Amino acid sequence: MTLARLKSVAGVRIPDTALCIAAVDLLESGSPKFLCTHCLRTYIFGSLAVRSLGGPVADEEAAFCAALLHDLGLIPPYRRDNRFEIDGADAARDFCTKHQVSPERAELVWRAIALHTSPGIAVRLAGEIALVHLGAGLDFLGLGLDQVPSQVLEEILEKYPRMKFKSQFRDLLVEHCQHNPAAQVLTWTDDVARIAGCTLHGQPIPTASQIMAAAPWDE
């Protein structure tokens, strides 16, 4: 996708190392275009958010790879039996290992992806981890959108359009939940699974309150 070959967007440099180019190629090879542009926006928004907080991102390459690959677990070739964040993190770490990234940096990428849906945790860790969390949160939920200047937002969306992201991403989440309903229990996607009619052992996906009430304790 030629959009990914831009040198910079909204004042954020797009890394063009061999590893970053390989990450783009991996993303493009099996992901729908709306997901590709989401991952690219995640990097731009996350970079701007971390910059505004004054936090450092020491490893730009690792941050870019984590942002680009953070939703791999939703794509059929990388789905296993875990919640999608873990499946995606595992796939990204395999990618890093294949490209001879050090174990420490591969672990950083893994954590950034595994924790990208963990409010209150990701922002307390390394800048690379916070970047993916903040960027994904802004693009998915609009968290911090009011802090993005209109001209900056316009440039980002011109370069990386949303392509009906909300509806298409929800459909992808539903498909993931239907593939593996057990992995959604006690995660933020459990309500998506319930609304989609997913069942576990013939019963609706339980809530946290139901699980606690059913625990084998008298009190």
Question: Model-found features: residue ranges?
Answer:
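Divalent metal-dependent phosphate-bond-processing catalytic cores, especially two-metal-ion Mg2+/Mn2+ enzymes
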Residues: 1-10, 28-36, 40, 44-56, ...
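Low-complexity intrinsically disordered segments
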Residues: 16-17
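Alpha-helix N-cap and coil->helix boundary residues
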Residues: 37, 58-60, 83, 87, ...
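An active-site-proximal "capping" alpha-helix that borders the catalytic cofactor pocket
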Residues: 41-44, 83-98
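His-Asp-centered metal-binding catalytic motifs of divalent-metal-dependent phosphohydrolases/nucleases
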Residues: 59-78, 84, 88, 92, ...
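Internal catalytic or translocation cores that form aromatic/hydrophobic pockets or channels
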Residues: 93, 98-109, 122
